[in-house]
Amino acid sequence: MDNQNIRIRLKAYDHRVLDNSTKEIVNTAKRTGARVRGPIPLPTHIEKFTVNRSPHVDKKSREQFEIRTHRRLLDIVEPTPQTVDALMKLDLAAGVDVEIKL
């Protein structure tokens, strides 16, 4: 490909699954002859939910839940056509959201 970069953003709730998927992508890209920048850990997005413990009374008694979204960024510099084919065929774990920009 003519001087292009592929930017891959990964999101997951479990950081271990995310790191394994990141390693798979990096190994695949390096094996096919592309240079990889990253993985760059992006800030973890924490979404908190506060709910009452009881159904009707005791406003002061509450419980908090949170969802943590872990994110990583990868840049593949000067990808070869073999790199693009290998990345298309790559089967990542369930629960990992992948965004690809050229």
From Swiss-Prot:
One annotated GO molecular function: structural constituent of ribosome
Lineage: Bacteria, Pseudomonadati, Pseudomonadota, Alphaproteobacteria, Acetobacterales
Protein name, as recorded: Small ribosomal subunit protein uS10
Disulfide feature: none
Assembly notes: Part of the 30S ribosomal subunit.
Record's function text: Involved in the binding of tRNA to the ribosomes.
Domain of life assignment: Bacteria
Record keywords, A-Z: Ribonucleoprotein, Ribosomal protein
Ribosomal protein recorded as keyword: yes
InterPro entries: Ribosomal_uS10, Ribosomal_uS10_CS, Ribosomal_uS10_dom, Ribosomal_uS10_dom_sf
NCBIfam families referenced in this protein's UniProt entry, alphabetically: PRK00596.1 (NF001861), rpsJ_bact (TIGR01049)
GO biological process, one term: translation
Pfam family, one: Ribosomal_S10
Similarity-based family: Belongs to the universal ribosomal protein uS10 family.
GO cellular component: ribonucleoprotein complex; ribosome
Organism annotation: Gluconacetobacter diazotrophicus (strain ATCC 49037 / DSM 5601 / CCUG 37298 / CIP 103539 / LMG 7603 / PAl5)
Gene3D superfamilies according to UniProt: Ribosomal protein S10 domain
Cross-referenced SMART domains: Ribosomal_S10 (SM01403)
